[in-house]
């Protein structure tokens, strides 16, 4: 896999607060190699290491996208949800940004059944068939459609398991991460100072609480995916 230049700038990362970790009492000792200092009771992440792993992740997603691979971005906490959806849509990736339904990947046949139901209901709504049903029946189906849109809207075009999963908050999305590990799906994960760096295939030490930090990391990864997609289209 060739190394590329992704314009990862330490000053830009500092401005986004990527280096701010959690309080020193709330940390995982396995993160010690990724921490450069303590300041006013919080750990400071070593941004040189962040840049290195972010660059590796960009190389990986570029290479995968240039071969037509499929991505899933997972980030369900409120402050990350909009950024996750925007980034995923921009890069034509699947995404989950509301709630991870247990077994979404490990019990794929059930997820697939739900997706078929979702597609059928969307078709019925578009054709106006829902409005021709008795009011009570229509109301029940519209509630179902709304529920499915909330939780499966970001994966409505997913036809199989993703090739790579990008996780925005390791602790928040631990169930999703465990499912990927069980299935052998490669993962890229943001890891704050309270996380375990050994769980994901590529762990990017970064502030997973600040919106600016999350956006910066997502923007770099999404740019690499888009570049990979362009390469794939040109070579097809």
From Swiss-Prot:
UniProt xrefs under PROSITE patterns: RIBOSOMAL_S2_1, RIBOSOMAL_S2_2
Gene3D superfamilies according to UniProt: Glucose-6-phosphate isomerase like protein, domain 1, Helix hairpin bin
CDD domains cross-referenced by the UniProt entry: RPS2 (cd01425)
Cellular component terms per the entry's GO annotation: chloroplast; mitochondrial small ribosomal subunit
Membrane among keywords: no
Assigned protein family: Belongs to the universal ribosomal protein uS2 family.
Organism for this UniProt entry: Carica papaya (Papaya)
HAMAP family from the UniProt entry: Ribosomal_uS2_B
Any single biological process term in GO: translation
InterPro entries: Ribosomal_uS2, Ribosomal_uS2_bac/mit/plastid, Ribosomal_uS2_CS, Ribosomal_uS2_flav_dom_sf
Identification of the protein by name: Small ribosomal subunit protein uS2c
Gene that specifies this protein: rps2
Annotated NCBIfam families: rpsB_bact
GO molecular function: structural constituent of ribosome
Record lineage: Eukaryota, Viridiplantae, Streptophyta, Embryophyta, Tracheophyta
Record's subcellular location: Plastid, Chloroplast
PANTHER family given in the database record: 30S RIBOSOMAL PROTEIN S2 PROKARYOTIC AND ORGANELLAR, SMALL RIBOSOMAL SUBUNIT PROTEIN US2M
């Amino acid at each position: 896999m060739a190394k590329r230049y992704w314009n990862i700038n330490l000053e830009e990362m500092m401005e986004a607060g990527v280096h701010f970790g959690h309080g020193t009492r709330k940390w995982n000792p396995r993160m010690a190699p990724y921490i450069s200092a303590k300041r006013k009771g919080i750990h400071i992440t070593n941004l040189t290491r962040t840049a290195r792993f972010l660059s590796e992740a960009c190389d990986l997603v570029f290479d995968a996208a240039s071969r037509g691979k499929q991505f899933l971005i997972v980030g369900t906490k409120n402050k990350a949800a909009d950024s996750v959806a925007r980034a995923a849509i921009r890069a034509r990736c699947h995404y989950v940004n509301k709630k991870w339904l247990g077994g979404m990947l490990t019990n794929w046949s059930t997820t697939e059944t739900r997706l078929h139901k979702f597609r059928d209901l969307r078709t019925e709504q578009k054709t106006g068939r829902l409005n021709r049903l008795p009011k009570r029946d229509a109301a029940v189906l519209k509630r179902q459609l709304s529920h499915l849109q909330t939780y499966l809207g970001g994966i409505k075009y997913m036809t199989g398991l993703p090739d790579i999963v990008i996780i925005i908050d390791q602790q928040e999305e631990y169930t999703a991460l465990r499912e990927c590990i069980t299935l052998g799906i490669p993962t890229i994960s943001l890891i704050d100072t309270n996380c375990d760096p050994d769980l994901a295939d590529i762990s990017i030490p970064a502030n997973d609480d600040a919106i600016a930090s999350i956006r910066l990391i997502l923007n770099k990864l999404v740019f690499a995916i888009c570049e990979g997609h362009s390469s794939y289209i040109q070579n097809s």
